[in-house]
Amino acid sequence: MNVLSLFDGMSCGQIALNRAGFKINKYYACEIDKWAIQVTQANYPNTQQLGDVTKVSALDLPSLDLVIGGSPCQGFSFAGKQLNFEDPRSKLFFEFVRLLKEARVKNPNVKFLLENVKMKKEYQDVISQYLGVEPIKVNSNLVSAQDRIRYYWTNISGFTLPKSKGLTLDDIVDLDVPDKYNITERFYEKVPGTLAFKKSRANLRGLERCSKTLL
C-alpha cells in the first residue's frame, strides 16, 4: 500500500495502519514541524518526508492507494473564533482536495480519510460538497475515558463503530501519585475565585464520568 499523509504530525496515521494490519510499501508524509518529524523518523525511519503540503504534487509520486489527513481545525472549532475558511489554516483543507484530485489521475479508485473537529453544519457541508461524502461522527468515549467528538469523511465502506467500553475517569486515574502533583490548599483558597475558574466550572467532571479532552 502506498500512502500519502497530509498534516502528518508524528505519524499517528502510520501507527493506526500498522495496528490494523495493513502492509505499507511507501509512506509519504507532509509535515513542517521539526519536532514532529523527528519523532516520526525515530519510530518510522523509512517515512519519506515531503515538507510543506502546498509545495507537493501527487503527480510526482507513484500511484497512491490511500490519502489521509486532518487539516488544521482552529478556524472551525467551537473553542476558537470560528473564522472558518477565512482562517488561512482552514484553507489548507483545499490542499487535501487538490492532492486527492491529483492522486486520482494515476489511481481513480484511491481511498481517502479526512478528520476534523465538530463544527457548524454550514462548514461541515462545504467539506462534504468538495469530498462527495457525508461525515461519520465518532466520539472517542466509545473506547476511552474522554468525550472527544470528531468527524471523518471517507470513501472507505464496510466498517462499523466499536461498541462502547463504558470507561470513566475512575478506570484510568492513578490516585497513588507523589504529593507534588496534588492540588494544594492554596489552590482552593485562590483559584476558585478567579474568573477563569468560574468560566471553566461547566467543564469540571467527576471520576464517575468521562473527561473532556485528555492531554
Features from the language model and the residues they span:
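Short strand-turn motif at the edge of the Rossmann-like AdoMet-binding core
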Residues: 72, 115-118, 141
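Hydrophobic aliphatic residue packing
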Residues: 53, 117, 172-173
